[in-house]
Amino acid sequence: MIVYMVKGGKYYRVEESVRLDAITPRGLYVNLTNRCDNDCVFCLRRTKEMAEESSLWLEREPSVEEVIEEFRAAPWHLINEVVFCGFGEPTLRLQELLELLRWLKHRHPTIPTRVNTNGLGELAHGREIAADFDGLLDTASISLNASTAERYFQLTRSSYGVGAYEAMLIFAEHMKKFVPNVVLTIVDKVNPPEEIERCREICRARHLQLRVRPFET
């Protein structure tokens, strides 16, 4: 699926989501790629079983035009946020992501936008990219995952090695200058309480917000 909606941990095609509930506002999720530069041990790519009709695995990466076609058909009276989040890392398709954010801000300026990211976009592109999101993005949700570089690498198996951890934190600080809401996340069942508290301390020291998110199955 290129675009989808979520309820109770299940992914639905937009038309099916609306058929089941034509009243409640919800997010519209955008799936741009299967590619990811991390290989997290807890990733849904490994653990979640999905029917073919509701799978997030893409046969190919959609073009900007194909995503916009999906946007044009979306039930905007029900949408309260647009979230770029799939089985891959959205910032690996940075130019397409930015073009779609520009389209959304022009056509639906009151709808908040969010990108769920591993925070390694500056490593992937070899430059600072935070300023690219200025005026386009309302929330950046960045996966913190751990309180140390070593534990981070054990969990994420990042293609960039242990240095990915500090790069992710620096990216979060860069994003604070251009994006109103920057949130770092960790997964509850993956981390014991003392590790979660250490992550809180790291976020406090860098003036960043932490969200503990539930493990999805």
Which functions belong to the PLM regions below?
Residues 1-34, 41-59, 76-78:
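N-terminal [4Fe-4S]-dependent radical SAM core
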Residues 14-17, 69-71, 126-130:
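A generic local structural motif
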Residues 21-22, 54-60, 64, 81, ...:
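Catalytic phosphate/metal-binding cores of nucleic-acid and nucleotide-processing enzymes, i.e., regions
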Residues 29, 44, 83, 141, ...:
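Conserved beta-strand positions in the central sheet of alpha/beta enzyme cores
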Residues 29-31, 81-85, 114:
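Short, conserved beta-strand segments within well-ordered enzyme catalytic domains
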Residues 47-49, 83-88, 156:
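Short, histidine-centered active-site or binding-site loop motifs used for metal coordination
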Residues 64-87:
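Short Fe-S-cluster ligation motifs
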Residues 90-217:
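Conserved AdoMet/S-adenosylmethionine-binding subsite of the radical SAM
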